[in-house]
């Protein structure tokens, strides 16, 4: 702002000027002359304009006015608050006074009004979908594509069929496409709660066996078909009938009820276990035994609801000449890629190029109110950590599956508490609970219930000649190379992996502390048994296995696994060469075959652990092989059981100790053995059943103590640690309350638009 100040200077007569002027006139008498007369104004006028008579001095004078201008500059900062609102004149709530679009523009009719018309039949499905898209889609614009989430990860889904999916990559997609009656959510304090989804409530009979559910009456599949109670019954009984041939995920429901569906056509809607009424949208299920975990089990993806009519229409049943069923895919081929109309959740699968990318777009018929913040989700499969790091750093992706060692690029530990990154504070991230974020990122410490482990296969196989190692349906044959009956007869009636001593020795050959501390950079907390810290009955376990190669070798020696085989002769399944006793020099191998140690490409931590175990076993005479496998080959090895030791992980299906013990060490007979180890220990099974079914805390605790004491003498896996680490995202991504179970649900996410280098709005 400018303030001018003006000052006038007084006029004065100039003698020199007057004399000069008067000499030029006809007047006589100038200063210094002898004659002086009195002047008049007429004399001054005769001289020229602007001359006036100065009678006191008897002179004609002109006044020169000089103006001096002094300029002073004062700067003020004026903060002008722009009016926020809807600036799009095409929107229902256009605000002509708004100067900055806040993303609140409303288009078309409301979600509820459109669905009411669709329910009444006044508009068809195509009109409803059109209007819903106009009404609900994200319209924000910015340089960061605020209506889209892009993620890079290392593992592709195996299937989008909830009835045969038991890997996290598949579950991450299934939870976007299909919905369940209940689901886990965060409570804002780091705890998990169960919230209703397709169900509005349930009641339980006095004996604890019969659950009666009431369902929402406003839910439609993505093709416009309405969901009824019968769809839930069909979905659950399909899981039981199909039997999860690849994943065995069906155990989660098998443990609770039987559909009594011997004819396999589901026309009896679950037999004696189920009743349902589509008119009232209610159904009941009767369990084998009371279960404190039942609601938790159906919150997992195996409890997802599919479109019963479309499944039946796409079900492939083959019969022989006599009409006997020879195969039944229970519509798996149709559900495998998540087709339109299959599910009721917020997204549909637009495209899936296996081992490359999956693209999801909105299911505009989705029942939950509110507009979409994310119109498109893309998941790309990238196994190279450096590529993911670069893409995340450059802002090409919102989530990049960042390796632990790369987190220092985005996070630091504020050691002096001044809220500023100081020199050296990003050298290491040891104090993970106190992690801080560098500009542009959000780093968060999370304590999870995810377990890192390595499973043992007690019944390993080899692929038959000519079979494809990337085809999960390839034929394979058991490797029988040991006399487990110990009856003195020289026969091979089992595999060496069936012997508890070998599995115990392998457990002592693993360097637990090095991997927890160095491989995982202190992101793995010790876990000594199946139950993770933070769960009920975790204190029934204690440390047994440590890194002790001398003990491992002693166990093998005492069990009769002496150095006797020519190492170069060993294969995965063929007959080995036995070195004559007199010719042995102590370099021979102890087992009749090579153990296949399995890890997947892109997971550098599993690869490092597998490498250490192979090296350690080699020093005590156990031959191994195990380069990292591409995901299709990894899954094929898993499904065909053509592996001996497999590094993997476990994220919970439901929050109960049984969800660790049963899938880890329960046999197939009690609905366990999720890892396909072939493990069966009657004492363990009996105690796990008690722990699962008992309603008495003391009885459950004792059952898990008994199971642990038996299991450590006969282990079927190495339990390495519980993951507690740091996650990172860009600061434009707004996430819902964090929960340590289940997938991210993209309908609940938001992404702030970036305009002219600045984020518009906030996540709060």
Question: Where is each model-derived feature located?
Answer:
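N-terminal lobe/hinge region of extracytoplasmic solute-binding protein
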Residues: 152-206, 340-344
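Append "and occasionally in soluble cytosolic enzymes with long acidic Gly/Pro-rich linkers
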Residues: 359-362, 466-484, 491-615, 619, ...
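Secretory targeting signatures
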Residues: 1-44, 66-78, 114, 506
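Detector for C-terminal structural segments
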Residues: 353, 418, 452, 507-544, ...
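Gly/Pro-rich hinge or "lid" segments in bacterial periplasmic/extracellular proteins
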Residues: 185-189, 290-293, 298-378, 384-387, ...
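Aromatic- and charge-enriched surface segment that lines or borders ligand/interaction sites
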Residues: 200-248, 282-286, 388-393, 496-498
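Surface-exposed binding/hinge segments that line
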Residues: 214, 248-324
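Ligand-site clamp/hinge motif
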Residues: 364-419, 424-429, 444, 448, ...
């Amino acid at each position: 702002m400018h303030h001018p100040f003006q000052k006038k200077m007084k006029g004065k007569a100039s003698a020199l000027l007057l004399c000069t002027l008067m000499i030029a006139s006809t007047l006589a008498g100038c200063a210094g002359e002898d004659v002086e007369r009195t002047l008049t104004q007429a004399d001054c006028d005769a001289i020229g304009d602007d001359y006036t008579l100065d009678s006191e001095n008897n002179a004609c004078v002109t006044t020169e006015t000089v103006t001096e201008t002094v300029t002073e500059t004062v700067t003020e900062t004026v903060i002008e608050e722009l009016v926020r609102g809807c600036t799009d004149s095409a929107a229902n709530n256009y605000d002509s006074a708004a100067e900055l679009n806040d993303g609140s523009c409303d288009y078309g009719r409301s979600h509820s009004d459109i669905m009411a018309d669709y329910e009444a039949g006044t508009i068809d499905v195509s009109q409803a979908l059109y209007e819903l898209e106009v009404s609900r889609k994200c319209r924000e614009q910015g340089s960061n594509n605020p209506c889209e989430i892009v993620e890079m990860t290392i593992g592709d889904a195996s299937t989008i069929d909830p009835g045969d999916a038991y890997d996290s990559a598949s579950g991450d997609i299934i939870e976007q496409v299909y919905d369940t009656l209940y689901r886990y959510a965060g409570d804002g304090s780091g705890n998990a709660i169960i919230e209703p989804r397709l169900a509005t409530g349930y009641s339980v009979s006095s004996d604890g066996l019969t659950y009666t559910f009431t369902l929402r009456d406003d839910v439609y599949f993505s093709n416009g078909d309405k969901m009824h109670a019968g769809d839930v019954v069909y979905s659950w009984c399909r899981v039981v009938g199909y039997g999860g041939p690849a994943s065995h995920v069906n155990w989660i429901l098998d443990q609770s009820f039987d559909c009594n569906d011997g004819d396999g056509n589901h026309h009896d809607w679950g037999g004696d276990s189920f009743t349902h009424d589509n008119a009232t949208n209610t159904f009941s299920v009767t369990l084998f035994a009371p279960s404190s975990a039942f609601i938790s089990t159906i919150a997992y993806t195996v409890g997802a609801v599919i479109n019963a009519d479309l499944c039946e229409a796409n079900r492939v049943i083959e019969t022989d000449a006599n009409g006997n069923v020879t195969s039944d895919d229970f519509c798996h081929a149709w559900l495998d890629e998540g087709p339109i109309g299959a599910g009721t959740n917020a997204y549909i699968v637009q495209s899936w190029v296996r081992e490359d990318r999956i693209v999801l777009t909105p299911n505009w018929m989705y029942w939950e109110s509110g507009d979409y913040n994310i119109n498109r989700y893309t998941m790309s499969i990238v196994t190279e950590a450096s590529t993911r790091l670069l893409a995340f750093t450059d802002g090409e992706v919102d989530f990049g599956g960042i390796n632990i060692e790369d987190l220092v690029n985005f996070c630091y530990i504020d050691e002096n508490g001044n809220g500023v990154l100081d020199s050296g504070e990003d050298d290491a991230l040891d104090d993970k609970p106190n992690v801080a974020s560098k500009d542009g990122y959000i780093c968060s410490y999370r304590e999870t219930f995810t377990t890192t482990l390595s499973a043992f296969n007690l019944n390993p196989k080899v692929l038959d000649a000519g079979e494809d190692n990337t085809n999960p349906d390839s034929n394979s044959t058991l490797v029988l190379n040991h006399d487990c009956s110990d009856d003195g007869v020289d026969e091979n009636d089992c595999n060496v992996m069936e012997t508890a001593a070998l599995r115990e020795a392998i457990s002592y050959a693993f360097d637990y502390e090095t991997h927890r501390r160095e491989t995982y950079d202190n992101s793995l907390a010790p876990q000594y048994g199946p139950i993770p810290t933070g769960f009920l009955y975790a204190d029934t376990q204690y440390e047994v296995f440590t890194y002790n190669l001398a003990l491992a070798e002693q166990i093998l020696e005492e069990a009769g696994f002496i150095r006797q085989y020519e190492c170069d002769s060993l294969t995965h399944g063929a007959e080995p060469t036995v070195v004559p006793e007199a010719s042995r020099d102590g370099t021979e191998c102890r087992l009749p075959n090579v153990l296949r140690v399995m890890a997947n490409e892109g997971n550098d931590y599993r690869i490092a652990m597998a490498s250490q175990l192979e090296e350690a076993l080699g020093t005590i005479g156990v031959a191994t092989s195990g380069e990292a496998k591409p995901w299709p080959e990894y899954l094929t090895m898993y499904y065909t059981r053509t592996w001996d030791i497999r590094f993997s992980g476990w994220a919970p299906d439901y929050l109960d100790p049984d969800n660790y013990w049963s899938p880890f060490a329960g046999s197939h007979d009690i609905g366990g053995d999720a890892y396909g180890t072939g493990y069966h220990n009657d004492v363990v099974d009996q105690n796990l059943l008690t722990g699962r079914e008992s309603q008495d805390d003391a009885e459950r605790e004792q059952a898990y103590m008994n199971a642990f004491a038996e299991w450590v003498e006969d282990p079927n896996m190495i339990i390495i640690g519980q993951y507690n680490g740091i996650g990172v995202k860009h600061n434009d991504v707004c996430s819902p309350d964090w929960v340590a179970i289940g997938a991210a649900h993209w309908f609940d996410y938001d992404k702030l638009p970036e305009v002219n280098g600045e984020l518009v709005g906030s996540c709060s």
